[in-house]
From Swiss-Prot:
Homodimer. This is Ferredoxin--NADP reductase. It catalyses: 2 reduced [2Fe-2S]-[ferredoxin] + NADP(+) + H(+) = 2 oxidized [2Fe-2S]-[ferredoxin] + NADPH. It comes from Streptococcus pyogenes serotype M49 (strain NZ131). Gene3D superfamilies: FAD/NAD(P)-binding domain (3.50.50.60).
Length: 330
């Protein structure tokens, strides 16, 4: 059975995509969000759910998880006209009668207009590259931290030397039984102040060492084998949980197949966020224009303009004057 055509399909379920979907709901149109990950929220939800964000208007500070929760709650007001598709990667889209055919790795979708809000593309964690690593992943081997209290009373080993690794180590110092950081260099790449705090903390620092093997039973890792760089010294670290903080790699390989105009790895847009294809718009980190500032707050400001332009494109004969939300919601 042919999928019904939604008014607007938003590619990307990060903060900008979620707010665009909310605003589209506010304007009374039907919306579909297609997200490649297994959950909504994008980088704030996946990469730094418990880190503080300080540049969201009206919030002195909030975590990535709180930002995501608020956006999803805001969108839930229009759940009757919003459809969410998770773990679907958009491969191509083509102009068809009445709109666009959007093909993903799972299905074919139809939409009258498209708003691209996929950031810098799909992203995946950089792994240890060790045999059996995949077997332990998401059991007691993690590439990001959603809840600090899940590590309470545990022996935690963290691999990495960047901001995330150092921040997680400091955050877990008073929660875990012990925290050990393994880094391949003596120098850390994290913020200087955080590194100083780390060096004066109770966190065990093992540098310069590299992971060589994982040992465990079933789906649970029990030991990490590490070797000192350029030496034969080998250590076995007992652990309850292992956090691999090597960062994430992004890929916009599919974005390049969408037959749009690009500037480096982003999509070139007009001042109204129109791409080189009529009816397709781009916002957030996916969009490129002169003077662009890559902030979440910037994307929030871009979303209403793109939605309004999409509605004007879909319904050119409708009275599309923008009304303030105070007049639309009781």
């Amino acid at each position: 059975m042919k999928d019904k055509a939604y008014d607007i399909t938003i590619i990307g379920g990060g903060p900008i995509g979620l707010f665009a979907a909310f605003y589209a709901g506010l304007r009374g149109v039907t919306v579909k969000i297609i997200e490649s990950l297994s959950e909504l929220g994008g980088q704030p939800a996946i990469l730094y759910p418990e880190k503080m964000i300080y540049d969201i208007p009206a919030y002195p500070s909030l975590t990535g998880a709180e930002l995501t929760e608020n956006l999803i709650k805001q969108l839930s007001r229009f759940e009757d006209r919003t459809t969410i598709c998770l773990k679907e990667e958009v491969l191509t889209f083509d102009k068809v009668k009445g709109g666009f055919s959007i093909r993903t790795n799972k299905a074919e979708h139809f939409s009258k207009a498209i708003i691209i809000a996929c950031g810098n593309g799909a992203f995946a964690p950089r792994t240890l590259g060790l045999e059996s690593e995949e077997n332990f992943a998401d059991h007691n081997l993690f590439y990001n931290v959603h809840q600090l209290d899940q590590f309470a009373g545990q022996k935690v080993v963290i691999c990495g030397g960047g901001d995330s690794a150092v921040d997680w180590a400091l955050a877990l110092e008073d929660i875990a039984e012990s925290v050990t950081v393994v880094h391949r260099r003596d120098a850390f790449r994290a913020h200087e102040h955080s590194v100083e705090l780390l060096k004066t903390s109770t966190v065990n620092l093992l540098t310069p060492y590299v992971p060589k093997a994982l040992k465990g039973i079933g789906n649970l890792a029990e030991k990490l084998v590490i070797q000192k760089v350029k030496e034969d010294e080998v250590l076995e670290l007992e652990l309850d949980s292992l956090i691999v903080s090597f960062g994430f790699s992004t890929s916009n390989k599919n974005l390049k197949n969408w037959n749009l105009d690009y500037k480096r790895s982003s999509i070139t847009v007009s001042p109204l966020f129109q791409t080189s294809q009529e009816g397709i718009f781009a916002i957030g980190d996916a969009a490129a224009y002169n003077g662009k500032v890559d902030l979440i707050a910037t994307g929030f400001g871009e979303a209403p303009t793109a939605v309004n332009q999409a509605i004007n494109y879909i319904y050119p004969d409708r009275d599309n004057r923008v009304v303030h939300s105070t007049s639309l919601i009781d």
